[in-house]
Amino acid sequence: MDNEEQKITLVDEHGNEELYNVLFTFDSEDYGRSYVLLYPSEAEADEEVDIQAYAFMPDENHDLGEGELIPIESDEEWDMVEEVLNTFLGDQDQD
């Protein structure tokens, strides 16, 4: 990812839009899917935030693009995403 933060707008079931920053994306060979982790764009740097995770179908450049986000539904898939997130956060703490 380049220095410019990627942003994405999520629309809830009531039609409200909220802007999120892309924390990172990754692929899973085990599940054959790509994933994106997001956090609210108005969050402060030292603020604890709820991180959202979704599966997505990458575009031809293997980027997030304009595609639809797919909810993660299985416990096994959530466990894998949490493990990747914890590894990412652990690596960030070491920097």
Curated annotation (Swiss-Prot):
State the superkingdom: Bacteria
- What protein name is recorded for this chain? UPF0473 protein PEPE_1260
Q: What InterPro entries does the record point to?
A: UPF0473
Q: Which Pfam families match?
A: DUF1292 (PF06949)
Native organism is Pediococcus pentosaceus (strain ATCC 25745 / CCUG 21536 / LMG 10740 / 183-1w)
Transmembrane regions listed in the UniProt entry: none
Disulphide bonds annotated for this chain are none
Q: Which family does it belong to?
A: Belongs to the UPF0473 family.
